[in-house]
């Protein structure tokens, strides 16, 4: 099916379900999962949009997700990195291309509904920016 699965996570409940879906897809084909956690950096004080996660928290959460899949017998790698506010979808699409992902898995809504209101859905943007299939999990 898919030898390489990219799953984009952000600590939301939908991301937890996306992680489970990525695990299942990889298990079906003895594939590999790449977990990507992007931390938006820009602070826009007048709008009240600030990074709500420290780099340490991001890495701890990523390590937990990697361990979960590894303990389930899935080949897994992970990366947590910073991105510019509003560039998350482009980063996800570029990462899928760079690492040869056959499919991108992500949650339908992330942690911030306010961000979704102003910028649109990250999942929607990824669908339009990539030539890869995208599985959106709710």
Cite the ranges covered by each PLM segment:
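Small/aliphatic-rich secondary-structure junction motif
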Residues: 3-48, 52, 70-77
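Internal alpha/beta domain cores that form substrate/cofactor-binding pockets in large enzymes
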Residues: 34, 79, 83-84, 95, ...
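A short acidic, glycine-rich active-site loop
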Residues: 50-60
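Structural beta-alpha unit
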Residues: 70-104
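Glycine-rich, Arg-bearing micro-motifs that act as flexible, cationic patches
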Residues: 103-125
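Short, flexible loop segments at boundaries between secondary-structure elements
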Residues: 134-137
